[in-house]
């Protein structure tokens, strides 16, 4: 395990582990580990992502696959105040460490034909005792229009006053003839 600047234990996973992760909301081998009294958001990401200039993924149209795997855990009363559209309040942020360009997006995966579900109503006293955990796996290029060039990004996720740990992702151009 690695320790970040705040002294928190962080998973140290090889970049290759993220190659087979698909977008969705499943827990997987790249999901950060949290303890029972954790409240907030944690993310994992590959340290390095390689891309071939001019090549696009036939399914996504993106120049690379930059996966972030995350977990969030909050008290029920906190999430209840954000309902029915919690997802519309989660923000993804990537900051270019050299140029200091900031890229942001809400993690909205809206289907305009699907209305937001009405949340069940529970007494506040009940919600204060309940903790809700959710997982997410996203390709940040589905949300952010990052330029196709070598760069290093500091990436994090926020929800109201909560901010995840910061991960650093380096985009590296594959040289001609280099294997994946």
Could you tell me what each predicted segment is?
Residues 4, 8-11, 15, 39-48, ...:
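Contiguous segments within soluble domain cores/interaction surfaces
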Residues 73-75, 143, 160-162:
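Short coil/turn motifs at secondary-structure junctions
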Residues 133, 150, 159-171:
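Short Trp-Ser/Thr-centered turn/loop motifs at beta-strand boundaries
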Residues 142-152:
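Short glycine/proline/serine/threonine-rich loop/turn segments at secondary-structure transition edges
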Residues 100, 134-138, 144, 167-174:
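Generic detection of short hydrophobic beta-strand segments and adjacent strand-loop junctions
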Residues 174-180:
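Low-complexity, Pro/Ser/Thr- and charge-rich linker/hinge segments at domain boundaries
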Residues 28-40:
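Proline/serine/threonine-rich low-complexity linkers at boundaries of modular beta-sandwich domains
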């Amino acid at each position: 395990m690695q320790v970040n600047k705040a002294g928190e234990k962080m998973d140290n996973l090889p970049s290759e582990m993220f190659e087979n992760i698909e977008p969705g909301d499943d827990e997987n081998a790249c999901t950060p580990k949290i303890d029972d009294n954790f409240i907030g958001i944690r993310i994992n990401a590959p340290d390095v992502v390689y891309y071939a200039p001019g090549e696009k993924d036939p399914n996504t149209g993106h120049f690379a696959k930059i996966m972030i795997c995350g977990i969030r855990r909050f008290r029920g009363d906190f999430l209840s105040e954000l309902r029915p559209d919690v997802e519309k309040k989660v923000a993804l942020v990537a900051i270019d460490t050299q140029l200091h360009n900031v890229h942001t997006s809400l993690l909205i995966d809206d289907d305009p034909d699907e209305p937001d579900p009405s949340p069940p109503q529970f007494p506040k006293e009940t919600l204060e005792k309940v903790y809700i955990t959710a997982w997410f796996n996203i390709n940040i290029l589905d949300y952010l229009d990052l330029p196709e060039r070598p760069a290093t990004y500091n990436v994090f996720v926020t929800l109201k006053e909560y901010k995840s740990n910061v991960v650093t992702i380096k985009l590296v151009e594959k040289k001609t003839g280099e294997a994946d």
